[in-house]
């Protein structure tokens, strides 16, 4: 697997005119409900250029006062050389992004040579049924499934987190795109010494394995951001969040986008 810096160097080659210099989960589903169902997917500004597509949840795209890193990634690239198109939408898991047809809409626009960045997990952690608003995916990366009955009486066969990620990666690569699978961004959590705590241990391993099995690139975005948090004091980190500990504000989204680009 290529190093992180060599991977990002490939992105810089696509956007050689870089504009900006880069210097334990809750047992119950108490996250705020973010539902951007009415938000239309973005479209490339210039269809003939290479496109960097982004798929994710509200930590990648959301509305003020919350803001996801995908909304700030475009500032690091020259719009005359590459499109940056954010299809991420609040309230979605890998499961619901796929089953609602949002992945297919993104995939329809992908052409050979494009890049696709995918980050899910924050809405995959809950149960597969009503208690988590039918958003959770089956834990793991295997072929195990769960069948749930929806509120309308219809049944759904829910696949694993890894199944959805691998399906997205494989279908994008089949169209000639380069795929990057990212671990979820960290929560606002601290250890007993007040240092940023690492979380997502299971999910980070699952994403890495999915990348390996599909030929996608893997970026441990959780660790990249946490390393940069290590350089800050706790109040400085807390100031970059818009809620209890999941969603960033505009300062936090810029911080996370810079961490991704800087590597």
Give the positions of each predicted feature.
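Serine-esterase "nucleophile elbow" of acetyl-processing enzymes
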Residues: 27-90, 104-116, 132-140
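Alpha-helical cap/lid subdomain in secreted, periplasmic
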Residues: 102-250, 254, 258-263
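N-terminal post-signal-peptidase region of extra-cytosolic proteins
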Residues: 93-105
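Sec/Tat signal peptide C-region and signal peptidase I cleavage site
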Residues: 22-26
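A generic structural signal for short coil/turn motifs at secondary-structure boundaries
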Residues: 61-64, 94-96, 189-191
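Bacterial N-terminal signal peptides
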Residues: 9-21
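N-terminal secretory signal peptides that target proteins for export/translocation
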Residues: 1-4
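Residues at alpha-helix caps and immediate loop-helix transition turns in enzyme cores, especially N-
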Residues: 65-66, 98-99, 252
